[in-house]
């Protein structure tokens, strides 16, 4: 890292960190201060800061606000919750909402409990809210595991009327994934038909149930699907006047083309035509236009990691401004893998695949193979009845030959997958679980259009992302709820985003540009809605106005658009340290996309860049000033500044004094022990010599003593106080240097305690060892 010529110094009166004991490991926390991928949100707003752009709606003891329906004509949001349906004026204004209590009779609840269901499950969870016509809504609920549907007069909004069975339209419980859409006043639903949830079905529910058009029960049609979304596209959106309305269903199902112990899941899209009447003999009351294809959103493991479809949103441009586009969230089916990918799919690419080769499952090898073109009958199976087909005397699906219907019954799956629009995901993240997505198109100040996506997470956060080229850049992470909970539904209404969850409906202002306080902040936000106004000296939602406004979505070149702002140097914090301590200096830029560098004293020799800052090993050369400088959009500024100082005046010399005293004591101890041993040895030698001289004088016989003589035997001498302190025999048996026990050595680096600082000056201490 380059050395800095400018070294910030602590000024008088500036705060300093409290000194901490000698040889402690100081750890200062801080976020990432380096270049990161655009899948990481540029900025994050905690709940305390996010509340300014949020409006909440909740009713005590009412839960599961999971079904949202926006009626732009009446500026009303309809909310389906547990046992209740609300009608709220948009945007939220604090006005008292209208409500309908759609409760389950006690007899139904008792019957539900007798079937072994829990008390909390035996409620009416609203699953469908749809606009039936200008005066009525269609609604369906689980009704304590006995689905019911009815209509609501929106002018009176008092009760659910004309109740009828909801089987085949609505799931039996909210845990069963389902999807439904109204097209031409007709409900198209994808759900399960039986109580156990083992009979999946896609229906056109109009008239009597026995007259419905539905999917066949063959597992080749639907095999344990989890439905995600249903979308209706009209010929006008295609620019095809000869076409028919098409209904697309998105789901994940278990593949039958793999021989594996694991149930391999595959994301797929299916399409049916609104004019389908079924077959005359073969496929009676069954879809004759049901075709499905794999959706490929490659992940880190070449597609396996993105095998579960979580949600799909359709972005519909204005008529004549382009064709719709589907945005899908994909995740992994394997436990422990937190992977989310976002892919875009064009309807024309789906159409191309549906017009391509069919796949045939070979039962002997469980592998799918393409059907040869010569084996495909004419007219082509699965096609909608168009004017061109009518000219060929096929006025409806009832007039199709049996060979065509038999083929489509046995070959509903296409051989080729649908690839994403750019051939790869727009975003892949391994640390965030996305559950819901909505999208809209925004016109920037330059007139160029950008797709803005809102991604709801598993823990209740909202990520706002803009599509720039072939990738998504996540601009902001917004915490929605005080307590983490999944985002269950999202709808857009003009500049407001409406979010449904278990405990509330949250309204988010998507044009909250005023919180960006400077020109550089406004430009770096890269929000197509926001622009900096030199006239007002604030960040505003431009609304197509151009006078005195600047914006740069793709480059965010602050240096050329904004006047140079006066640099505000941060407070320099003094950090008291001791020799050999490890100190981590945090750097906390406001943007995770900023590139940061450290300027440090030229004498520092041991430093390590980390995700949370800079780690420095304290040496005399490491003393001095440190500065973290971050750059984004061509503008650089110092984010954090520190000054390493000795913990106290005695810290640096006391270390050398302590080590020197220890070494001196060590050598003095060896010298004293040696002198003591020499003196003891000489004393014993002199005593032995005196004994030998005394024996010579009395004619002592060194052999066996004769009878009548007295033998003299010497008992072992009792140990002296010196021997008790240092027994010679024990010392010689020791394993130390020279046969003696090793002396006590002063550990120059005792085990350091850990001090965790949440910032500077010292905030909290957690000492594990001192």
From Swiss-Prot:
Disulfide bonds: 112-122, 140-149, 273-384, 297-343, 513-530, 522-539, 587-628
GO BP terms, alphabetized: axon guidance; cell-cell signaling; negative chemotaxis; negative regulation of axon extension; nervous system development; neural crest cell migration; positive regulation of cell migration; retinal ganglion cell axon guidance
Chain positions covered by the region annotation Disordered: 696-725
UniProt motif (PDZ-binding) ranges: 768-770
One MF term in the entry's GO annotations: semaphorin receptor binding
Domain (Ig-like C2-type) ranges: 580-635
Annotated positions of the Phosphoserine modification: 718, 720
Ranges of residues in domain Sema: 42-510
Topology relative to the membrane: Single-pass type I membrane protein
GO cellular component: dendrite; endoplasmic reticulum; glutamatergic synapse; membrane; perikaryon; plasma membrane; postsynaptic density membrane
Annotated glycosylation sites: 64, 133, 509
Membrane-spanning ranges: 660-680
Record topology, Extracellular segments: 35-659
Cytoplasmic topological domain residue ranges: 681-770
Location relative to the cell: Cell membrane; Postsynaptic density; Perikaryon; Cell projection, Dendrite
Residue stretches making up the PSI domain: 512-563
Keywords linked to the UniProt accession: Cell membrane, Cell projection, Developmental protein, Differentiation, Disulfide bond, Glycoprotein, Immunoglobulin domain, Membrane, Neurogenesis, Phosphoprotein, Signal, Synapse, Transmembrane, Transmembrane helix
Biological function: Probable cell surface receptor that regulates oligodendroglial precursor cell migration. Might also regulate differentiation of oligodendroglial precursor cells. Has growth cone collapse activity against retinal ganglion-cell axons.
Subunit note: Interacts (via PDZ-binding motif) with DLG4/SAP90 (via PDZ domain 2); this interaction may promote translocation of DLG4/SAP90 to the membrane.
Record family assignment: Belongs to the semaphorin family.
Protein name from the UniProt record: Semaphorin-4F
Organism: Homo sapiens (Human)
């Amino acid at each position: 890292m380059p050395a800095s010529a400018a070294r910030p110094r602590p000024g008088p009166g500036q705060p300093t960190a409290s000194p901490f004991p000698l040889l402690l490991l100081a750890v200062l926390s801080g976020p990432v201060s380096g270049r990161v991928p655009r899948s990481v949100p540029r900025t994050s707003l905690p709940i305390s800061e996010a509340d300014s752009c949020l409006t909440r709606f909740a009713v005590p003891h009412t839960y599961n606000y999971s079904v949202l329906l926006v009626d732009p004509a009446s500026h009303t949001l309809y909310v389906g919750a547990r046992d209740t349906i609300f009608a709220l004026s948009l945007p939220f204004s604090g006005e008292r909402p209208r409500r309908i209590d759609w409760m389950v009779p006690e007899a139904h609840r008792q019957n539900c409990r007798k079937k072994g269901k829990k008390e909390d499950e035996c409620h009416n969870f609203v699953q469908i809210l749809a606009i039936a016509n200008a005066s009525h809504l269609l609604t369906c609920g689980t009704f304590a595991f006995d689905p019911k549907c009815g209509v609501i007069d929106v002018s009176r909004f008092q009760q659910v009327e004309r109740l009828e069975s909801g089987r085949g339209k609505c799931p039996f419980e909210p845990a069963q994934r389902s999807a439904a859409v109204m097209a031409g006043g007709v409900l198209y639903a994808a759900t399960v038909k039986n109580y156990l949830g083992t009979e999946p079905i896609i229906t056109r529910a109009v008239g009597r149930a026995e007259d419905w058009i539905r999917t066949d029960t063959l597992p080749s049609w639907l095999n344990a699907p989890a439905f995600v979304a249903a979308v209706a596209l009209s010929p006008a959106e295609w620019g095809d006047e000869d076409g028919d309305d098409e209904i697309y269903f998105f789901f994940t199902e278990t593949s039958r083309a793999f021989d594996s112990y694991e149930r391999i899941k595959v994301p797929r899209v299916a399409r049916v035509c609104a004019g389908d009447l079924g077959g005359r003999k073969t496929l009676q009351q069954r879809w004759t236009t049901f075709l499905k294809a794999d959706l490929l959103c490659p992940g880190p493991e070449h597609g396996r990691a993105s095998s579960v479809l979580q949600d799909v949103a359709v972005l519909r441009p204005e008529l004549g401004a382009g064709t719709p586009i589907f945005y899908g969230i994909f995740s992994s089916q394997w436990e422990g893998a937190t992977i989310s990918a976002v892919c875009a799919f064009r309807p024309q690419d789906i159409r191309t695949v549906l017009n391509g080769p069919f796949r045939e499952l070979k039962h002997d090898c469980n592998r799918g193979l393409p059907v040869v073109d010569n084996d495909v009958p004419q007219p082509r199976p699965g096609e909608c009845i168009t004017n061109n087909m009518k000219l060929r005397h096929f006025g409806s699906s009832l007039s199709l030959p049996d060979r065509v219907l038999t083929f489509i019954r046995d070959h509903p799956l296409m051989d080729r997958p649908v690839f994403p629009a750019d051939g790869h995901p727009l975003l892949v993240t391994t640390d965030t679980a996305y559950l819901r997505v909505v999208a809209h198109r925004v016109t920037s100040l330059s007139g160029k259009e950008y797709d803005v996506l809102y991604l709801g997470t598993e823990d209740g956060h909202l990520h706002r992302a803009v599509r720039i080229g072939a990738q998504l850049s996540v601009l902001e992470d917004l915490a929605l709820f005080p307590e983490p909970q999944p985002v269950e539904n999202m709808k857009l209404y003009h500049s407001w985003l409406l979010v449904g969850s278990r405990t509330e409906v949250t309204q988010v202002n998507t044009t909250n540009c005023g919180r960006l306080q400077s020109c550089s902040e406004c430009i770096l936000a890269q929000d197509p809605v926001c622009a900096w106004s030199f006239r007002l000296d604030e960040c505003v939602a431009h609304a197509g106005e151009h006078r005195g406004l600047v914006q740069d979505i793709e480059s965010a070149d602050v240096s050329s658009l904004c006047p140079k702002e006066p640099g505000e140097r941060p407070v320099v914090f003094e950090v008291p340290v001791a020799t050999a301590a490890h100190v981590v200096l945090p750097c906390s830029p406001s943007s995770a996309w900023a590139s940061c560098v450290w300027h440090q004293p030229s004498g520092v020799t041991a430093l390590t860049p980390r995700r949370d800052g800079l780690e420095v090993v304290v040496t005399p050369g490491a003393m001095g000033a440190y500065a973290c400088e971050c750059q984004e959009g061509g503008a650089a500024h110092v984010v954090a500044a520190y000054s390493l100082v000795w913990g106290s005046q005695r810290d640096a010399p006391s270390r050398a004094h302590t080590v020197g005293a220890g070494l001196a004591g060590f050598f003095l101890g060896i010298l004293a022990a040696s002198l003591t041993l020499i003196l003891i040895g000489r004393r014993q030698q002199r005593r032995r010599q005196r004994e030998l001289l005394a024996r010579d004088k009395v004619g002592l016989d060194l052999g066996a003593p004769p009878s009548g003589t007295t033998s003299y035997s010497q008992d072992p001498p009792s140990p002296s106080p010196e021997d008790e302190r240092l027994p010679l025999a024990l010392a010689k048996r020791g394993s130390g240097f020279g046969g003696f026990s090793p002396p006590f050595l002063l550990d120059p680096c005792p085990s350091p305690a850990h001090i965790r600082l949440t910032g500077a000056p010292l905030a909290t201490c957690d000492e594990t060892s001192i």
